[in-house]
Amino acid sequence: METYTLANGVAIPKIGFGTWQIAEGEEAYNSVSFALKAGYTHIDTAQIYGNEVSVGKAIADSNLAREDIFLTTKLWNDKHDYELAKTSIDESLERLGVDYLDLLLIHWPNPKALRENDDWKAGNAGAWKAMEEAYKEGKVRAIGVSNFMQHHLEALIETAEIVPHVNQILLAPGCNQEDLVAYCQERDILLEAYSPLGTGSIFGNEDVEAVAERNGKSVAQVALRWSLQKGFLPLPKSVTPKNIEGNLDIFDFDLSEEDMAVLDKIQGIKTQDDPDKVNF
């Protein structure tokens, strides 16, 4: 599997298997197990997904060594506090059945409960301090954030000892977030792309279908290839074996500049939810 190198030198596989909305139990276990057999070596989960136990069991039951799997989870919005985050990290490790995480993220920057008087800033700073300590202790190999816009990153970096290694945001053809992407790339913050198929909104788009036909690939494959050629790390998710396998088949072709330009300008694609206004 091809890799990117994070700012701290840690190698991270260029595509990951996302597990959002994949239910705890048989569905999560079977999906992750199949993904690992298909060739994924990067699994992305989160505390709020509720499937850490099954994800961890699938990893433990695979034929892969722990060091050959890149595992990510995320702190939920009720853990934006130093002590709560510190405890929560250990709880995730226990649920996943592992001794360390490869990547730990703050899931959202501005929980609804912390919006008054910009309390989110102190909340993020406290959680980040706990994450920095976990990083230094070897419990986590890299730390980052998710859904952070530029002003959230600026506030965090102001008090942080370690600049986030990753920012996971919604990126898909037609949802480019160019200013935020430029800000992160200038600071060597790797961009992970969740919902890299625009939560399905690219399907049925005539322009995307034309690009797919020209390249002899599926709509999903050209969207994921677009992410790679932008320098992003896509995190597709599926419970369908055919799609799980197909989403990996993106390393044997290149999109032309013309095709990339077409995908950049796609209209009507799902865009990033405003993290300052989400209802949680």
Where are these regions (language model features)?
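Active-site mouth loops of central-metabolism enzymes
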Residues: 15-26, 75-82, 115-117
